[in-house]
Amino acid sequence: MKYIEFDESRPMDLVLLGRVAIDFNPAYNDQVKEEFKPLKKVHMFEKFVGGSPANIAVGVTKHGLKAGFIGKVSDDQFGEYVVDYFDERGIDTSQITKCTNGEKLGLTFTEMLSPKESSILMYRNRIADLQLHVDDIHEDYIKNAKAILISGTALAESPSREAAIKAVMLAKKVNTKIIFDIDYREYNWKNADEISIYYSIVAKEADIIMGSREEFDLTEKLIKEGMTDEESAATGRQKMQRSLSSNTV
């Protein structure tokens, strides 16, 4: 078995690229208990930073790792909230830039009907995180990281998809390990073929892929439908062996 080795001399443990949003959950504290009721009857919410890569950034810093975030936020109070939230937790925000054409952060409202029943109401029109541009991606920043995590939602639309692919290309160039978090969200995509095209581009270059069986099926749709977990893993091993062989002098 071949293990993935990270360059321990690099100052940043993980750089994350992609979706950041604002989550509103029914308030539940000593003063207010709003859970287990329809969303239309909830009057008070608690606000958090959300989005898979944002949550991972917070999680790894809690475990003592150094993380940075590449992303786009709205030029308003919510955008400032995200940057402050990250700064307070020790996440580097030097690569977070503000939108200039009025795009807004995504807003997500959680409905909790019971301990086992929940759903979300999401607003993602003219969304800030998908405005990330190739000019926002810098080789030196990626070169300083042991690994970069690419969120699949960043591939849903231009100009973000080109920015994400540029980050992947630069990571390969400077030998920063690539983690692909498929992070499938149906509302971001127009059709299944488009999903497979862009997911597979990044998956082929990734050292680690995070996803469910459904997400792997979406990625593999135009390559080979109906693959099992074992077949997907074997394909990944073959790709890694080819990569290791090509890097051998």
What residues fall within each predicted segment?
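Glycine-rich phosphate/adenosyl-contacting loop at the front of the ribokinase-like
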Residues: K2-D92, K116
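A short, aliphatic-rich alpha-helical micro-motif
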Residues: S9, Y141-K143, S200-A203
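Active-site metal-binding loops of divalent metal-dependent hydrolases
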Residues: V20, T153, I182
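Conserved N-terminal subdomain of the carbohydrate kinase-like
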Residues: K66-I150
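Hydrophobic beta-strand scaffold residues
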Residues: A67, T93, I178-F180, M210
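Catalytic-core regions built around general acid/base machinery
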Residues: P159, A163-V174, I197-E205
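A short helix->loop->beta-strand "cap" motif at the edges of active sites that frequently abuts
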Residues: L170-K177, S246-V249
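Conserved phosphate/ATP/ADP-binding segment of small-molecule kinases
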Residues: N188-V249
